[in-house]
């Protein structure tokens, strides 16, 4: 009895101590994870078939294999859940949580530990980092063909100056676009041959550019801003090699890195828009060429007559009537008002005002009308760079509507014209006086001018005629208040015009009034003398001065010309 008492007392004592100690309670709750001795491990392994061998052997092989592996090599001991269980037991003993809430707290603590401080998380991160390194290495191996090109390009760029005199932004933006071209396009290579570097592209046929000569040609053109009329003279400075480089790099540029106000930015934008148009209507030329080749004519020069006939007799299409929707017109008025206020109140340049207006737009408003706003802002940017006066008039005019070129993409901005009324000293009165003076001088010849200077102020037919012309002109220029008087003045002017005689008629009447003079014929002697050996002794059939009247009468001005 004593022995039994001694056996039961410790067990009761141990259970009481475990209930008071959370760590012992957690150890008892997680008993399968404690360390086993070698004898316990052997007995556990052999106990798989101790009961009934046929029962164990009849199980699937996968289940038997898992049981054997687990019995021989148990899973790694992880005390995390034991520690969490200890914490939960301590919270229950202290009254922080109820006993029925322990399972939820235990699950939440395990989930948080596995999320933020778990070996599995670290291993997953290591696997993810390994996958990333493998993907990067694979990408580098795929692009191994461009590594040599990038190395050659970097060595070429190392020889270029870091800064230029002007246009530093355009210079760095163009270099970035060139790097993007070499790294992204698979059929593009850069190599060195002697002191020169070459760029070779095989996208649409093999095209080779001498980078050294191209950058030497572009050296004085970085940041050059050329107006519309001076672009032709600057265009002559670019070589075909440089133009090809600009054409290849243009798809990788934008108006942010390279300013569109500069000449190179204008060319790159032009090339980029030209390459962006995929639809080219060349069916007529292809059909005519195919028919000609089928007929045995390989020379395309013989097709000029056919092509000229097709171009001459093509049907003309009625121009489309472009107009804005009410919503688009409201957008135009909003942008006009915003840009004009920025320019007048904040004293910003046109380009800065457009940029600030675009930056302050509401995102939802811009997202709903993105295409039209981009098109309108691009049109205003072009107008501000090419025709500032036209841009100012378009922004300040509350009734302005975009022209046809805005819809078709053919931008043709009008140039400034110097009108007569632009001068500060000109007026309509001065213009009228100049016209009257010119009208009087038109009907006066040189003889009448000299006579008018020498003779006193006696009225002459010419002066009376001038006065009549002036009166008639004044009557026409003055505003006509009475219709009857205007008709009478027109009749008087017509009667005077009918009585006027032309210079030809006056010369004919004067010639008819003169008596006819018969001049004796001149006889030339057969014997030539030295005194008369001047080349004019014989009549010349090419120099005939016979006849009466003034031989230069046909050079005098005619008075019969109309106003």
Swiss-Prot record:
Q: Where in the cell is it found?
A: Virion; Host nucleus
Q: Name the site position(s) for Cleavage.
A: 548-549
In residue numbers, the region (Disordered) covers: 449-472, 522-543
The record's account of how the chain is modified after translation = Cleaved near the C-terminus by the viral protease during virion maturation to form the mature protein.
State what induces this protein: Expressed in the late phase of the viral replicative cycle.
Tell me, in one coarse class, where this protein mainly resides.
Answer: virion
- Keywords linked to the UniProt accession: Capsid decoration protein, Capsid protein, Host nucleus, Late protein, Phosphoprotein, Viral genome packaging, Viral release from host cell, Virion
Residues making up the propeptide: 549-563
Q: Name one GO cellular component term.
A: host cell nucleus
Residue ranges annotated as compositionally biased, kind Low complexity, are 462-472
Residue ranges, annotated region (Peripentonal hexon-tethering domain): 1-117
Report the sequence similarity comment from the record.
Belongs to the adenoviridae hexon-linking protein IIIa family.
- Function as written in the Swiss-Prot or TrEMBL entry: Structural component of the virion that acts as a cement protein on the capsid exterior which mediates the interactions between the hexons, including the peripentonal hexons, and reaches all the way to the penton vertices. Two hexon linking proteins IIIa, one from each facet, stabilize the unique edge interface between a pair of facets. As the virus enters the host cell, hexon linking proteins IIIa are shed concomitant with virion acidification in the endosome.
Subunit description:
Interacts with hexon proteins; this interaction tethers the peripentonal hexons to hexons situated in the facet. Interacts with the penton protein (via N-terminus). Interacts with packaging protein 3; this interaction is required to promote correct genome packaging.
What is the protein name for this chain?
Answer: Pre-hexon-linking protein IIIa
Q: What is the lineage of its organism?
A: Viruses, Varidnaviria, Bamfordvirae, Preplasmiviricota, Tectiliviricetes
